[in-house]
Amino acid sequence: MRDSMSEADRSSPGSGKTDREDETAENATQDVIAVTPDDERTGLANRLDAHTGDGVRHRAFTCLLFDEDGRVLLAQRADRKRLWDTHWDGTVASHPIEGQSQVDATRQRLAEELGIEPHQYDKLEITDRFEYKRRYLDEGLEWEVCAVLQATLHDTSFDRDPEEVGGAMWVDYEDLYENPRYYRQLRLCPWFEIAMRRDFEGDADPVPDGTRA
């Protein structure tokens, strides 16, 4: 059944540690694209290595989908996630693979994680790109040059994959930024918080330091 929700829809708890170990093993078999601060490719890095120890700067994206009333669709990271498990994110976030554009990677994740297809939204646009580095407990870190993509949903139905998305809800985007005290129960992912702040404070720029499209 496809959903169009305004309140959180949480899955029942999974097996926790076992699922997390499975994800760690899966990450060890994958690569991410290592980049310079200006998002220039320097090579490939093992995904697990890029998120442990000192980390490796790599290419990533986060996507914010809105409805026609200005609400943003937030997704809760599943409890099997090793980093920022059960935290609330933008609509999707991930890493493109070698040879894949940010737009194509975003479309793929929207379809896989939420069952949202391209005919449901207008053109995806890269609205910002920034570098950040954050550690999470003793589990690892993110060190990313993160592109932000945005679009408006004309058909707000979706069908989340509980292995990836623990819950989903619509939130007034402006209210979330201006009144964070009302949303204290939502632990937000750092990359989403940065993207939202830059969006409202006028810092969003899809070209890092004005040097690259």
UniProtKB/Swiss-Prot annotation:
Binds 1 Mg(2+) ion per subunit. The magnesium ion binds only when substrate is bound. One of its GO terms (cellular component) is cytoplasm. This is Isopentenyl-diphosphate Delta-isomerase. The gene is idi. Pathway: Isoprenoid biosynthesis; dimethylallyl diphosphate biosynthesis; dimethylallyl diphosphate from isopentenyl diphosphate: step 1/1. Its EC number is 5.3.3.2. Residues 1-34 are annotated as: Disordered. The keyword Isomerase applies. The keyword Manganese applies. CDD domains: NUDIX_IPP_Isomerase. Belongs to the IPP isomerase type 1 family. It comes from Halobacterium salinarum (strain ATCC 700922 / JCM 11081 / NRC-1) (Halobacterium halobium). Mg(2+) binds at E113. It catalyses: isopentenyl diphosphate = dimethylallyl diphosphate. Residues 56-193 form the Nudix hydrolase domain. The lineage of its organism: Archaea, Methanobacteriati, Methanobacteriota, Stenosarchaea group, Halobacteria. Catalyzes the 1,3-allylic rearrangement of the homoallylic substrate isopentenyl (IPP) to its highly electrophilic allylic isomer, dimethylallyl diphosphate (DMAPP). GO terms for molecular function: isopentenyl-diphosphate delta-isomerase activity; metal ion binding. GO terms for biological process: dimethylallyl diphosphate biosynthetic process; isopentenyl diphosphate biosynthetic process. It is found in: Cytoplasm. Its cofactor is Mg(2+); Mn(2+).
